[in-house]
């Protein structure tokens, strides 16, 4: 086997690899798969934010089948960070308060938000199931106590403990931070996935869990 042939083969392999790399780099395009937010979410580096609402049917569907698997595939690059949208649903404000408290409890206990023991997960899916599966409306905004009780019962928390936890500075900071969810949600609705606070993924372009994870990985390293 001649050295000239080996050199030619080596160059061919290098060219093929370069073309493959170039193709991979251009597999996702701005304006088709994602957009750059004009107003980035502050202090969101190395995060995969999901803006959601308990009253959003697609948020429920994505949380059942997509959010967890994608977050697991990109956990080495970004941390999953839920942002509840206070402005959607009759009880958006109350839901945000319940979720912020439960997230703080999970974080203090070192429990993943995807773990079966997560109080956030228990409350979230209790609301999803009640609202979307059983069509519960809690008197259409006239019974906030009943709405809150649904989440607290699922998470195993008393009203007194909830009231006390709600005053925690960490919880209040979370609620303040979540106000940025509105500007993101009004672009294409919810759910809305944002990488590093800058890149909004177009949900209509998501083809599979693997392709979404690949997109998140690409955006996370920009």
Would you name each region that the model predicts?
Residues 2-93, 173, 179, 184, ...:
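Extracytoplasmic thiol/disulfide redox context detector
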Residues 24, 29, 35, 129-132, ...:
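Compositionally biased, intrinsically disordered low-complexity regions enriched in proline and serine
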Residues 49, 192-193:
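Catalytic His-Asp charge-relay segment
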Residues 87-189, 196-198, 202-215:
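Cysteine-centric redox/oxidoreductase cores and disulfide-bonded domains
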């Amino acid at each position: 086997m001649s050295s000239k042939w080996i050199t030619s083969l080596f160059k061919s392999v290098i060219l093929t690899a370069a073309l493959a790399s170039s193709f991979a780099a251009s597999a996702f395009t701005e304006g088709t798969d994602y957009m750059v937010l004009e107003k980035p979410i502050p202090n969101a580096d190395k995060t995969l934010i999901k803006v959601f609402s308990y009253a959003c049917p697609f948020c429920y569907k994505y949380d059942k089948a997509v959010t967890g698997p994608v977050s697991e595939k990109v956990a080495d690059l970004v941390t999953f960070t839920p942002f509840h949208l206070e402005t959607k649903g009759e009880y958006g404000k109350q839901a945000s308060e319940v979720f912020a408290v439960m997230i703080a409890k999970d974080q203090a206990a070192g429990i993943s938000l995807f773990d079966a023991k997560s109080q956030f997960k228990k409350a979230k899916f209790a609301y999803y199931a009640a609202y979307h599966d059983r069509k519960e409306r809690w008197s259409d905004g006239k019974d906030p106590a009943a709405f809150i009780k649904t989440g607290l019962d699922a998470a195993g928390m008393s009203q007194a403990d909830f009231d006390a936890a709600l005053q925690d500075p960490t919880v209040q900071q979370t609620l303040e931070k979540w106000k940025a969810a509105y500007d993101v949600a009004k672009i294409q609705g919810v759910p809305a996935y944002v990488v590093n606070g800058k890149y909004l993924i177009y949900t209509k372009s998501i083809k599979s869990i693997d392709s979404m994870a690949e997109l998140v990985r690409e955006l996370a390293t920009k």
